[in-house]
Regions:
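A charge-rich, low-complexity, intrinsically flexible signal that marks solvent-exposed coils, linkers
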Residues: 1-111
Length: 111
């Protein structure tokens, strides 16, 4: 499978599935869904209700991010996810997904 096909496979993943995984991860680490919603809400500029509606909508990650404006401070999000520096990810959509992953990882670790 070539690199673009791998990206397209990720982009087609339902946001609701990712959100469910995020909830399980932060709760396993002693944090709450509300804390997760606060972090995601800051990043993607949505309320908890809007995040929940998006999770239930069946939207893919591509569809989910196409409707959003990120925080104006998104460029300050730096670090590694799965050994990859998020600020160096070339594909804009994948960079946004990796930034979201990084924020959830940091919440789970208590940062």
């Amino acid at each position: 499978m070539n690199e673009q096909a791998k990206l397209e496979r990720v982009f087609a993943y339902p946001f609701g599935d990712i959100y469910g995984n995020y909830v399980a991860k932060v709760e396993r680490k002693g944090h709450t869904r509300d804390e997760l919603d606060d972090v995601l809400g800051w990043f993607i500029q949505l309320s908890s209700e809007e995040i929940h509606a998006a999770a239930e909508s069946g939207k893919t990650l591509r569809e989910f991010f196409s409707d959003l404006s990120l925080t104006p401070h998104a460029e300050l999000i730096t670090g590694k996810v799965c050994g990859v520096r998020v600020e160096e990810v070339e594909d804009e959509l994948m960079r946004r997904i990796r930034m979201m992953d990084l924020l959830v990882d940091e919440l789970a670790r208590g940062k």
